[in-house]
Each structure stands twice: as C-alpha cells, then as structure tokens.
C-alpha cells in the first residue's frame, strides 16, 4: 500500500502537483478517534462527508440509517452461509429495539452511534466484499463507540501528563 502511494506522490511531483497528506503518523495517535483522524485521510474524509453526515452524523439515526443497517445485516447473513449468523443478528436487533423502546436514554445513544457503526462497516466492505473485512470494520466501529462512551470518565483523559499519553498510545496500538 505504501509503495504505490509513494509512486503516486512521486508521479504527481514530477507533473507539478502537490498531493495532500493521506497518512499523518497514525501509530502516534493517543486514542482510537485520533488514529482514525490520521489514518487514510482521503478515504476517511470521503466516508464522513458522503456517508456519515448524510445519514445524520452523531445527532440522530435516520430512516436511511436503519434501512442500511437492515441491508448490511441481510448482506452479512447471506455471505456467512450459516444459519446461526441471522439468528444472532435477529437477537441483537431485538435487544436494541427493546432497549430503545423502554429507555429514551438508550434510544438517544443508539441514534448517536448507529451511523458511526454503519460507516465503519461500510468502510470495511469497501476494502473487500468478504466477511473478514466487514468484521474488521465492525470491530473498528465498536472501538470508536467504546472510546466515545468512556472518554469522559477515563482517568487517562488529561493528555498533559506523559504517563497518560503513554497509556493512550499503548491502548490504541
């Protein structure tokens, strides 16, 4: 990946163009959110501008968000080729539905994070139409959701101390 990126940068320089930075030392990131801000900036920006924000961003889940969640679950169920994957997804959706039905706080939390998860899953699907890449996207989305959940209560939130930066860097890697 780095090789053909370097070739593209070199050819652009030979032609007199200056390309934007696409990777900004992501492995020096102090948290998961910072990692994704630094990693593959052109793709991340495209996913944010043309997928995440039109679906509602972190403010709300739209009809499109939930429709896309259904499509992704259907797609994953079909390519998994096993009976238990749709059953697991059905149970997961039932738990989310019941939680949102009986708790307005949980519903707001789901609405705020469904678009983030969908964007990461679809970003994984963009890398390859296999279950491995979809799971990779889902795990990264889950990491971002967990980070958003715990960043305000984290004892390592103060990045002015060297040991907090070290802990954040270690957890991110």
Model-derived features with residue positions:
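Membrane-embedded transmembrane alpha-helical bundles that form the catalytic cores
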Residues: 1-173
